[in-house]
Amino acid sequence: KELQENYNICVSDDFFGVLETDTGFVYSDLSVKSAINAACKLGAHTLCDEIVRICKENGVYKIQTQNSSIQAKQILISAGSYVNEVLGVCEFDLPKVPVGIRRKVVNWFDTDSYKLSQGFPAFILEFEDDYFYGFPDFADGLKVGRDKVGEIISTREERVEFGSYEQDTLDIGKHIKEFFPDLKDFSKGSVCTYPLSPDDDFIIDFLDENLFFMGGLSHGFKFAPALGLLGVKALQTQKLDPSIKQYFSLKRFG
């Protein structure tokens, strides 16, 4: 009843809601940009889309880019959906990192309600064996995604543009108005990808004596400051914190 009265969300009587008043949402692009800017202020250099190959000679990694050659004693790799492309440039033996890729879509809907300015929050809503998630309208409409649907792909080329499949609008649009009755027409959609480890959790481990990997889970940008600190400490000490190793080691997959 309170969900309907306060937020105009229609659910059955067996639903209950939890409101977390001290939470919010993160702009992914801005958070990544902020992290890069902070790193540059500390002396980091950025090269985008330039690594051609990485080899290892006498314990030193030699990184060949399109325009230069870099030598390093240690490497930290943080990669998402296309991790195997990144690891594929390494010309030495590494354990396989089992990360798949799911093509995902999100939809926007026009509305005069569900606005950030009206106090409407970001949300997660259970639905069958899945859940909808989304964000209030603060510019382009109510943004809605659905967690477990989407096509399993293996290459960038298979991440086709929005609208290539009928399900790009049906997976969300077929049911979402049952819960949000004030939604108007579908406005637009976009495509992204989820990296998928076998147990839907991070993989954090040494792949080589001085090559440390973090990845395997979507939305890693939210945890980037903590993951970065963890990775640097692991390389400095040459060991992984036992609590991290227990839950996130690559060895858990056998």
Predicted features along the sequence, with ranges:
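C-terminal catalytic lobe of FAD-dependent flavoproteins
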Residues: 178-254
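Short hydrophobic core segments
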Residues: 70-86, 228
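A short alpha-helix-loop-beta-strand transition element characteristic
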Residues: 1-4, 12, 94-99, 185, ...
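Short loop/edge segments at beta-strand edges and connector loops
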Residues: 47-50, 65, 188-190
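Active-site acidic short loop of glycosyltransferases
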Residues: 65, 72-73, 209
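Flavin (FAD/FMN) cofactor-binding and adjacent substrate-gating region
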Residues: 1-43, 47-49, 53-59
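Active-site substrate-recognition segment that forms the wall
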Residues: 81-209
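Short, hydrophobic/aromatic-rich segments at coil-to-beta transitions
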Residues: 59-63, 119-122
